[in-house]
Amino acid sequence: MSAETPITLNMDTQDLQIQTFTVEKLLEPLIIQVTTLVNCPQNPSNRKKGRSKRARVLLASVEEATWNLLDKGEMIAKEATVLKEELAAALQEVRKESKALKVSAERFTDDPCYLPKREAVVQAARALLAAVTRLLVLADMIDVMCLLQHVSSFQRTFESLKNVSNKSDLQRTYQKLGKELESLDYLAFKRQQDLKSPSQRDEIAGARATLKENSPLLHSICSACLEHSDVASLKASKDTVCEEIQNALDVISNASQGIQNAPAPPEPQAATLGSAFDELENLIVLNPLTVTEEDVRPSLEKRLEAIISGAALLADSSCTRDLHRERIIAECNAIRQALQDLLTEYMSNTGKTERSNTLNTAIVNMSKKTRDLRRQLRKAIIDHISDSFLDTTVPLLVLIEAAKNGRVKEIKDYAAIFHEHTGRLVEVANLACSMSTNEDGIKIVRIAANHLETLCPQIINAALALASRPKSQVVKNTMEMYKRTWEHYIHVLTEAVDDITSIDDFLAVSESHILEDVNKCIIALRDQDADNLDRAAGAIRGRAARVAHIVAGEMDSYEPGAYTEGVMRNVNFLTSTVIPEFVTQVNVALDALSKNSLTALDDNQFVDISKKIYDTIHDIRCSVMMIRTPEELEDVSDLEDDHEVRSHTSIQTEGKTDRAKMTQLPEAEKEKIAEQVADFKKVKSKLDAEIEIWDDTSNDIIVLAKKMCMIMMEMTDFTRGKGPLKHTTDVIYAAKMISESGSRMDVLARQIANQCPDPPCKQDLLAYLEQIKFYSHQLKICSQVKAEIQNLGGELIVSALDSVTSLIQAAKNLMNAVVQTVKMSYIASTKIIRIQSSAGPRHPVVMWRMKAPAKKPLIKREKPEETWAAVRRGSAKKKIHPVQVMSEFRGRQVY
């Protein structure tokens, strides 16, 4: 391609730095051959000297690799239109160094144990590698020159498009620009894939996206400017788009040449919060022997103050609620005091070989305060996300509607609201990044947020232009293009923020917010406030839709099974039944308020459907958390402990939870409950031993057994004041879930029993199924008895012990029945397979496959925290007699 304008290459032709994978790959064969050729021992051998046939073969390989590179270099030199002299000189240098290596290598192969000859070969090999590298780097520069020529060609057409004076020239120039963009994008993509630097690859990818996105916008805006040259906002939009395109061209030019673009603005201090918390938690556990106040105190205090500064930024954010601001401040003060107490204890223990109990207590307290502050920050951020991303497009739609109707006076107010809305979205997105460790997700969030910031003033200018020319079709088209672009990046930002946010935290906070909105709805209805009722109902619909969307997306990442089916059943119930019923009731209420006929409205029916939508959200959250570990459940439980909201529709949100009341039982009752729980855990260990050997990917019986086991464990945790179940209604719901799982297990096991040809085996399996049905019903009764516990005179009545004991006993009996059912189902399945295999293939009800053992490394890798350890002496080899090994072997326990 001939360049009309000289292309300036900002690359040093003498620089041997390899920037691309292609050059690296071309050099690799030569490096391997040369390295193998000169790879001989440092100390010469005393053996008889002789010629090495292997070395001569390697020398031939080096020559072959060199000549292959020379052939490619000569082809490039013939086709090149630039750097011809440099290429010719580089080729000559490679030939010269190749001959020098050949001479020194032949001498070396005659006497491979003579060190001076070896050193001569090494020097010649290095010179050859340097010459070849320079040749390949020059060839790479020619590729860059080709790309820059396309950039220059696009630049010229781009300048022509900016200055067109009529629509025919505009259309012709835009078509030419489209073709050149296609060629430029292809070459830029190739360069992007070839560059070794991840940051430069990302820069080119972003620039390519900017060119594709802004080129159609430029055409539309230029067309509008030709029709309405007197509209200043159109000219401002055109200047902004042109600046974006020019910046993208500069980025491609610089990144392809390895030039660092303008440094990105420093991340806000809050962006380091997550890693700062991790570092602080790792540093608070020290050895008293090595602690000195001069080193430890300034270091820990500096790190803590950095965290508190970031927390203060979050607390002062316009999105932060007053309640959370106060709690963040309180936790900051508490962690400051905990650190001072910890440092005081360290100074008291200086020089001691072991930590005292008070020091250990101070360390535990500091860790707890760190977790508490982290939790408060996380809650505040989730609050912001839940509120800000509730309805992301309404401000834009209102702005566009005002512009279409030509309401110029209102545009400024709506533009200010839209600008504030954009700023809030960007601020909340950055806050979400501050506590996340998902680097890829954070990168996507920041890119999308930057695009929204750039689009905001352009959209406002487009709206101003539309307001001044509401009947112009080209201005309408421009506004529509901006709207689609905005909606695209809003979708990207929302998905990215959801991706870096814990779904458990989001569901817990969303449940709380929906309860607040439900209360606002009921208050507004009773106060006959139609505006607040409509606003709160809209918030409920938006939050419920967000919950359904996020949970459905989360389930897409799981293999279909009992877990996903249970979750999606609740989600579908929410979207297909509950939300439509709620919308209907809200419309009825609003209609009644507008006609002043509130007396004809059934107030209780509205309260019931409002409570139903909250209960469904709670059910979705419980079903999502069914597979969580006890530690994860406890963390989410802590997230909610101080997030209780008093409900006007349910007395259960007043005062302490029933779970908290269980901790106030007399010590004698607690001991008896602990004994019952210990017996239950013994039975649980039997079930664990029975199901842990089976692969549950195609065995729903094992899946259901695990699920029932987990729910029963949660119910027993409730009796000790722990776990995710907070109210007696949760216990009743858990018993209902167990009953449903038992019914599904009954269906599967009965299919196995019906196919089993062994009557005794079939009879035993059916008997165990009857036990599951009986004990499931008993468990439901016990959970309902527990719900009747009352608080009289500030103390729990004595019958609580009997209720709890009955609950745990029923759970233990049910667990035993599940254990026996799993065993007998497997036995019956084996009989079906053995007897009916000769009659032809038959699909089994479930597949009984042994679980594959966990993968273990052949060589134990040293843990990062153990890298400081001194070199240890190898343990002495010890012979163990086989009889001793056999005597210590213990198989799986049979119950």
Swiss-Prot record:
<dbReference type="GO" id="GO:0045296">
    <property type="term" value="F:cadherin binding"/>
</dbReference>
<dbReference type="GO" id="GO:0005856">
    <property type="term" value="C:cytoskeleton"/>
</dbReference>
<keyword id="KW-0963">Cytoplasm</keyword>
<dbReference type="GO" id="GO:0086091">
    <property type="term" value="P:regulation of heart rate by cardiac conduction"/>
</dbReference>
<dbReference type="GO" id="GO:0008013">
    <property type="term" value="F:beta-catenin binding"/>
</dbReference>
<feature type="region of interest" description="Disordered">
    <location>
        <begin position="635"/>
        <end position="660"/>
    </location>
</feature>
<dbReference type="Pfam" id="PF01044">
    <property type="entry name" value="Vinculin"/>
</dbReference>
<feature type="coiled-coil region">
    <location>
        <begin position="74"/>
        <end position="107"/>
    </location>
</feature>
<keyword id="KW-0597">Phosphoprotein</keyword>
<keyword id="KW-0206">Cytoskeleton</keyword>
<feature type="modified residue" description="Phosphothreonine">
    <location>
        <position position="361"/>
    </location>
</feature>
<dbReference type="GO" id="GO:0098911">
    <property type="term" value="P:regulation of ventricular cardiac muscle cell action potential"/>
</dbReference>
<keyword id="KW-0130">Cell adhesion</keyword>
<dbReference type="GO" id="GO:0030057">
    <property type="term" value="C:desmosome"/>
</dbReference>
<dbReference type="GO" id="GO:0030027">
    <property type="term" value="C:lamellipodium"/>
</dbReference>
<feature type="modified residue" description="Phosphoserine">
    <location>
        <position position="160"/>
    </location>
</feature>
<feature type="modified residue" description="Phosphoserine">
    <location>
        <position position="637"/>
    </location>
</feature>
<dbReference type="GO" id="GO:0005912">
    <property type="term" value="C:adherens junction"/>
</dbReference>
<feature type="coiled-coil region">
    <location>
        <begin position="325"/>
        <end position="379"/>
    </location>
</feature>
<dbReference type="InterPro" id="IPR036723">
    <property type="entry name" value="Alpha-catenin/vinculin-like_sf"/>
</dbReference>
<dbReference type="GO" id="GO:0098609">
    <property type="term" value="P:cell-cell adhesion"/>
</dbReference>
<feature type="modified residue" description="Phosphothreonine">
    <location>
        <position position="649"/>
    </location>
</feature>
<dbReference type="GO" id="GO:0086073">
    <property type="term" value="P:bundle of His cell-Purkinje myocyte adhesion involved in cell communication"/>
</dbReference>
<comment type="subunit">
    <text>Interacts with CTNNB1. Interacts with PKP2.</text>
</comment>
<dbReference type="GO" id="GO:0051015">
    <property type="term" value="F:actin filament binding"/>
</dbReference>
<dbReference type="GO" id="GO:0005737">
    <property type="term" value="C:cytoplasm"/>
</dbReference>
<dbReference type="InterPro" id="IPR001033">
    <property type="entry name" value="Alpha_catenin"/>
</dbReference>
<comment type="similarity">
    <text>Belongs to the vinculin/alpha-catenin family.</text>
</comment>
<protein>
    <recommendedName>
        <fullName>Catenin alpha-3</fullName>
    </recommendedName>
</protein>
<feature type="modified residue" description="Phosphoserine">
    <location>
        <position position="647"/>
    </location>
</feature>
<keyword id="KW-0965">Cell junction</keyword>
<dbReference type="GO" id="GO:0005916">
    <property type="term" value="C:fascia adherens"/>
</dbReference>
<keyword id="KW-0175">Coiled coil</keyword>
<comment type="function">
    <text>May be involved in formation of stretch-resistant cell-cell adhesion complexes.</text>
</comment>
<dbReference type="InterPro" id="IPR006077">
    <property type="entry name" value="Vinculin/catenin"/>
</dbReference>
